[in-house]
Amino acid sequence: MTAHRDAIRTARSLVVKVGTNALTTPAGVFDAGRLAGLADAIEARMKAGTDVVIVSSGAIAAGIEPLGLSRRPRDLATKQAAASVGQVALVNSWSAAFARYGRTVGQVLLSAHDISMRAQHTNAQRTLDRLRALHAVAIVNENDTVATNEIRFGDNDRLSALVAHLVGAEALVLLSDIDGLYDSDPRKTKGAKFIPEVTGAEDLAGVVAGPGSDLGTGGMTSKMSSALLAADAGVPVLLAAAADAASALTDASVGTVFAARPVRMSARRFWVRYAAEAAGALTLDEGAVRAVVHQRRSLLPAGITAVSGRFYAGDVVELRGPDAVPVARGVVAYDATELATMMGRSTSELPGELRRPAVHADDLVAV
């Protein structure tokens, strides 16, 4: 067993993401029995001393049959109605499954807004931490019923990566109907090559990933992207089939493992890089790009050539090179209107109260 798999096996805290297809029959019907089987595997890991947070998809699928729908809805309003009905069935099923072991579950519904706003982000972290301290099993899902756009987290793949860092998990396990990463879809391509371990971008050369299924939204593209996000932040990831949950959670001997970067990203830098929504953008000249990206220096107003968006001091903004390609993200120190009058000007030309960097190096993350 490699050191990367060993990191999954020995992790003292896990986030386990359960995909929609792991909770439904081949006919697309929500199956509480499948959920109970996964709960058994998760319970075994918890009994061994590991703290587990569950990110569970399946609310929309669980609402299809009770509402008399013939298939997963396509429009947002019906998706939200199905999620509203299905979330009740979903969390009740998790509650019943863990009640067999004397455990209590807590439901945590998050939206992209909750993750992107620093105050809500911190409150969500506190809630999850308190649930764990009280020995309740947190069941996290996207709050589909209040979403203003189409479901965005990719069947919760991205959400699970964000939650893993949010709670300080030592590993993330993605369980679905896919037994790991291949260079192409093994269901469509004969001889597709299985990739047991991803340690760098070179391992993904030539990989062709596909979209999600009719019941779920998270295809291999979503899973791969989310796994790389978590790994880049310092959280090792195991992608495995739900049918292999017992092995995945016991010894990590199945699936594809994504190796984590050696040094875990700080909570603040992770939020800036991955969770926060950019409120605007700053275009930089070549010299400023070199200073920010390669020399890890603060961004000064002199290096800014354009300001776009409506943002305020403390917001996260995207930093772009002269070619408009994003090069970094950071917390801006000035409002957009204020910065527009400062850009391109030397610090010595500015009043004393405006001589702070536009974005301090401590609040910058290269992308």
Swiss-Prot record:
Catalytic activity annotation: L-glutamate + ATP = L-glutamyl 5-phosphate + ADP
Function: Catalyzes the transfer of a phosphate group to glutamate to form L-glutamate 5-phosphate.
Listed Pfam families: AA_kinase (PF00696), PUA (PF01472)
Organism: Mycobacterium avium (strain 104)
A GO molecular function held by the record: ATP binding
Record-annotated PUA domain positions: 279-357
Any single GO BP term: L-proline biosynthetic process
Family: Belongs to the glutamate 5-kinase family.
Gene that encodes the chain: proB
Pathway field: Amino-acid biosynthesis; L-proline biosynthesis; L-glutamate 5-semialdehyde from L-glutamate: step 1/2
Name of this chain's protein: Glutamate 5-kinase
Record-listed ATP binding positions: 17, 176-177, 217-223
Keyword ATP-binding: yes
Any single GO CC term annotated in Swiss-Prot or TrEMBL for this entry: cytosol
E.C. number(s) listed in UniProt: 2.7.2.11
Main EC class the enzyme belongs to: transferase
Subcellular location: Cytoplasm
Residues bound to substrate: 57, 144, 156
UniProt xrefs under InterPro entries: AceGlu_kinase-like_sf (IPR036393), Asp/Glu/Uridylate_kinase (IPR001048), G5K_ProB (IPR041739), Glu/AcGlu_kinase (IPR001057), Glu_5kinase (IPR011529), Glu_5kinase/COase_Synthase (IPR005715), Glutamate_5-kinase_CS (IPR019797), PUA (IPR002478)
SUPFAM superfamilies per record: Carbamate kinase-like (SSF53633), PUA domain-like (SSF88697)
